[in-house]
Structures are given as C-alpha cells and as structure tokens.
Amino acid sequence: MAPPKPSAKGAKKAAKTVTKPKDGKKRRHARKESYSVYIYRVLKQVHPDTGVSSKAMSIMNSFVNDVFERIAAEASRLAHYNKRSTISSREIQTAVRLILPGELAKHAVSEGTKAVTKYTSSK
C-alpha cells in the first residue's frame, strides 16, 4: 500500500509544473509518492530539535521502500507455498521474522501486533 499525499512541513513537495505539449493540451506531471512526511514525523517525535537533509531523506525513503519490497515479496512467497491467495497479517509477521535479524524482528513484530490491534479496535 502506497502512502497518501504528503502534507506535513519539511517534506518534499511533488512537482506541479504544467507543460504545454505540441497539441496544445495541458498535462500535469505525475506525483512522486514517498514516505518523507512519515519519516519526518517520526524524527520529530524522537528528536524534536533535529533536521534532515534532502539527501538523507532520499536515503531513508529508499531504505523504507527496500524493506517494504522485501517483506512483501517474502509474504507473497509464503502465501504461495501455503496455497493461499490472500496475504494476511500472519504472512507479514512470518516474513518480518525471516527478514529482520534477532532483536529487531522481535520489536517489529510487537509494534506490528500493537498497530493491528489498535486498527481493529478503532473499526
């Protein structure tokens, strides 16, 4: 699932430049989706007085995308092995345990479980 439109301070704004092609019709540039807004929010929760450069934000965004793709691919593989057509929280949890090392996996699983519980209780 891709993140929604960026809106917070400190995030890179998407290009809204309107170009005029040969046929005379206006075309808008596609918006580049990123996790920069959410990375910035987490940074401000952890270190309110610390900033982040655009290069560092780009690296963090690449990192989040990479981890997301690895977990999604592993969860997809697990669902296929078990002849399931739906990826559930169980597949995601198992994928996280397989991909992330030791203590990091334990923390990720507990935070994920907490997030799923919060989401289901709010419905």
Swiss-Prot record:
Family: Belongs to the histone H2B family.
Statement: the UniProt record of this protein carries the keyword Cell membrane: no
SUPFAM superfamilies listed in its UniProt record: Histone-fold
Cell compartment(s), UniProt: Nucleus; Chromosome
Keyword DNA-binding part of the UniProt annotation: yes
Molecular functions (GO terms): DNA binding; protein heterodimerization activity; protein-containing complex binding; structural constituent of chromatin
PTM comment text: Monoubiquitination of Lys-118 gives a specific tag for epigenetic transcriptional activation and is also prerequisite for histone H3 'Lys-4' and 'Lys-79' methylation.
InterPro entries: Histone-fold, Histone_H2A/H2B/H3, Histone_H2B, HISTONE_H2B_site
Positions of the UniProt region annotated as Disordered: 1-32
Function, in words: Core component of nucleosome. Nucleosomes wrap and compact DNA into chromatin, limiting DNA accessibility to the cellular machineries which require DNA as a template. Histones thereby play a central role in transcription regulation, DNA repair, DNA replication and chromosomal stability. DNA accessibility is regulated via a complex set of post-translational modifications of histones, also called histone code, and nucleosome remodeling.
PANTHER family, sorted: HISTONE H2B
Name this polypeptide is given: Histone H2B 2
Cross-link (Glycyl lysine isopeptide (Lys-Gly) (interchain with G-Cter in ubiquitin)): K118
Primary gene name: his-4
GO cellular component: nucleosome; nucleus
Key words of the record: Chromosome, DNA-binding, Glycoprotein, Isopeptide bond, Nucleosome core, Nucleus, Ubl conjugation
Assembly information from the UniProt record: The nucleosome is a histone octamer containing two molecules each of H2A, H2B, H3 and H4 assembled in one H3-H4 heterotetramer and two H2A-H2B heterodimers. The octamer wraps approximately 147 bp of DNA.
